[in-house]
A protein has these predicted regions:
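Long, charged, low-complexity, helical-prone intrinsically disordered regions
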Residues: 1-366
């Protein structure tokens, strides 16, 4: 029987913070950070800054500039896969699964539906591949839109966009770059490194291992998340957390590591807080992204930034970058726990650092 590690909540929180590179020792650069975190999530909302850049700044500080991420993508050291920026070498962990799309063995009803829909639109799929072969990389608007069977959509996507998403999952096309906010599409073989695909079972176990290394502590099985799971299967070793029900898996390399915390402002999409259930269980922290709520129903703001202090999440900063006005508007600093004078000063320093990194002046909302 493997050893079951028994952790206090403080132990568990520190493992999570260490894993996410949010402790006192900053990583050596964007690529080492990306390899440890396994991904940087892209999101079109940039109320303060694009989320991937904000996550990198939280780890690297003001030595990081967004051009570093663009350069790494242009040089194919990082690759965009399904709105996640991943180390180029990690793509080999997905290629075998792509080749098996929509899955092996008996398919679920949803898998059959997706397979049949793509087959029904095979003419459009082939036309897209031919256009990319001859002219790529291309933005979506320059690709054929000749789907014979429309995608049943709630308004978030159209047929061509959905077909491109499935073609990504099939390993046929990939994002080759961006022109402004437009993704540029090309044949996957021109974008992905020519590394041998890792067999499916081995690749899933390795992805679980890397995910646990990035999270520090996670459930063996958990709720389903789109694109990137939050659970880790049998990776690591079993653990119990005092005051929290159920079993966890922990990366044993992070146990008994000296912890030196710091204060940090986080993206709402930061992996430390992305799994809201885990955040509540380990940090006893209540958080929701409220930009989709009517203004009158928001508790913390449109794009409130979680505040990490040591191994605790202690508040939220409601801020917005007004780039035309040249200011970072700070609407409120919400204190989940009463701030000491020292903590308040550290939070203000982080806000000042954020404004300086953005090249903006601080403006306090009336």
């Amino acid at each position: 029987m493997p050893q079951i590690h028994r952790l206090s909540r403080a132990d568990a929180r520190r493992v999570a913070v260490l894993a996410q590179l949010l402790h006192g020792e900053r990583p050596g650069g964007l690529l080492p950070a990306a390899r440890r975190l396994t991904l940087l999530q892209l999101d079109p909302v940039s109320a303060v800054a694009p989320s991937a850049d904000l996550v990198a700044w939280s780890r690297l500080g003001s030595s990081y500039v967004p051009g570093h991420l663009r350069a790494a993508l242009d040089e194919r050291r990082l690759i965009e896969l399904r709105a996640m920026v991943r180390p180029a070498e990690d793509i080999a962990l997905y290629r075998a699964e792509m080749a098996e799309w929509p899955g092996r063995g008996e398919l679920t009803e949803w898998q059959r539906h997706r397979r049949d829909w793509v087959l029904a639109n095979d003419r459009c799929r082939r036309e897209i591949l031919a256009r990319l072969r001859d002219e790529g990389p291309l933005p979506s608007r320059r690709l054929p839109d000749t789907c014979d069977r429309p995608w049943s959509s709630t308004g978030w996507t159209d047929s061509k966009t959905q077909l491109l998403e499935f073609m990504v999952q099939r390993g046929e096309v990939a994002v080759a770059g961006r022109a402004g906010r437009d993704r540029l599409w090309d044949l996957a073989g021109r974008v992905y490194p020519d590394h041998p695909p890792v067999p499916t079972g081995e690749a899933r176990r390795e992805r679980d291992r890397r995910r646990l290394r990035a999270l520090g502590l996670a459930r063996p099985r958990g709720p389903e998340f789109p694109v990137e799971p939050a659970d880790v299967g049998e990776a690591g070793e079993p653990a119990l957390v005092e005051g929290v029900r159920g079993e966890w898996r922990v990366d044993p390399a992070l146990l008994d590591v000296p912890f030196h915390g710091r204060t940090a402002l986080l993206s709402p999409f930061d992996r430390l807080v992305h799994d809201r259930t885990r955040t509540q269980e380990l940090f006893e922290y209540d958080y929701q992204l409220e930009m989709y709520k009517p203004a009158a129903k928001r508790r913390w703001g449109y794009y409130a930034l979680p505040v990490l202090h040591g191994d605790r999440l202690v508040g939220k900063v409601d801020a917005r970058a007004d780039r035309k006005g040249g200011v970072l508007v700070v609407n409120a600093v919400h204190q989940d726990v009463p701030f000491t004078a020292d903590l308040a000063a550290e939070v203000e320093r982080e806000i000042a650092d954020l404004a300086g990194w953005l090249g903006l002046e601080i403006c306090r909302a009336a």
